[in-house]
C-alpha cells in the first residue's frame, strides 16, 4: 500500500500577548533579565501554549538510528557495526541516554530507521526501517525522494501517536556511525558554506582522517550539485535515514504545537532542513546545548539560537537534550509559581 506524501500545516506562534507575557516575567520578584536565558525561554513557551499556566506533559525522548554508506570509507573512529551494538545497548538500558532519561523522567523510545542489520528479538525498538544503510553519498544518492517522503510519513505517525498520548514536549537524539559526515554535507549544501567550515572530528578522528572526510564530502556536494534543488532533494542526496525521520518528526511536532528540544550537531542539521522546508518550525525549537563539533556554533547562529548549555558534549544520543529538561522545567516553574512584586509586597525593581 502506498503512503501519501505528508504535508505539514505549521502555524507561526502568535506574538499578540507578548507585552502581557513579558510584563508577567518582568514583574516577578527579581530584576528584569536576572534569570538569563530562562526568561526568553519562558516567553517562547508561553507563546506556544498561551500566557496562563505553562506545563510539560509526558516529555519524550526519541532516538533515531541509521547507518551510512560513507562510513565504509573510515570517516569515523568506529565501524558501522557499532550502530547496531549501541541500539542493543539502548534497548537494554545501558547507554548514557538511558541513564539520563531515567534520572530526569523522560519516556525513551528508540527508532530503527535503517541500520545495516536489524536487531532481532529485543523489545523496545520501533521498526521504521527505510533500508539497510544509505548509499555512499560520494558515489550515489543516499536514498530516493520517495524514501524521504516515506520517512516523513512514518515520522508524522510516530509524533501523532505521542501527541494522542498527551505528550507536549519531544526531544531528539540519534545514533549512526558516519552521521556527522551526512550532517556536515547537509549544512554545507543548505548554508552554502565551504566544507572546511562544516566538517569536524566527530567522535574524535585523526587529522589525516579529517582530511579524507572533508574530501569525500566535497566529492558528494560536487556529484549532487545539480540534483539538490530544494531541502528534500538535499536529504535524498546527502541525508541519513535517521536525519530524514528526525526532520519529519520536527515538522510534525511543530504542526501539533509541541515543544521541540534539539540535541547536538546532527539533530541541529535536521532542524536546519525542517526550518528550510517551513520557517515557522523555528518558533517551536528549543536548542539544548552547543556541542564540541566544529560547525555546530555556526549552524546555531544561522538559526538565531542561543543554546541552554555548553558542556563540551560530543556524544549525541540526545544526551544534551535530556540534560536541558530541568532548565526547561525551571522556566515553566518560575513563570507559574514565582511571586510578583505586588504579591510579595516588595517595591518593584525596574
Swiss-Prot record:
Catalytic activity as recorded in UniProt: 5,6-dimethylbenzimidazole + nicotinate beta-D-ribonucleotide = alpha-ribazole 5'-phosphate + nicotinate + H(+)
Class of the enzyme per the UniProt entry, highest EC level: transferase
UniProt xrefs under InterPro entries: Nict_dMeBzImd_PRibTrfase, Nict_dMeBzImd_PRibTrfase_bact, Nict_dMeBzImd_PRibTrfase_N, Nict_dMeBzImd_PRibTrfase_sf
Active site: 317
Biological pathway: Nucleoside biosynthesis; alpha-ribazole biosynthesis; alpha-ribazole from 5,6-dimethylbenzimidazole: step 1/2
Enzyme Commission numbers on file: 2.4.2.21
Keyword Glycosyltransferase: yes
GO terms, molecular function: nicotinate-nucleotide-dimethylbenzimidazole phosphoribosyltransferase activity
CDD domains assigned to the protein according to its UniProt record, in alphabetical order: DMB-PRT_CobT (cd02439)
Single GO biological process annotation from the record: cobalamin biosynthetic process
Keyword entries, A-Z: Cobalamin biosynthesis, Glycosyltransferase, Transferase
UniProt cross-references to Pfam families, sorted A to Z: DBI_PRT
Alphabetized PANTHER family for the sequence: NICOTINATE-NUCLEOTIDE--DIMETHYLBENZIMIDAZOLE PHOSPHORIBOSYLTRANSFERASE
Protein name from the UniProt record: Nicotinate-nucleotide--dimethylbenzimidazole phosphoribosyltransferase
Gene: cobT
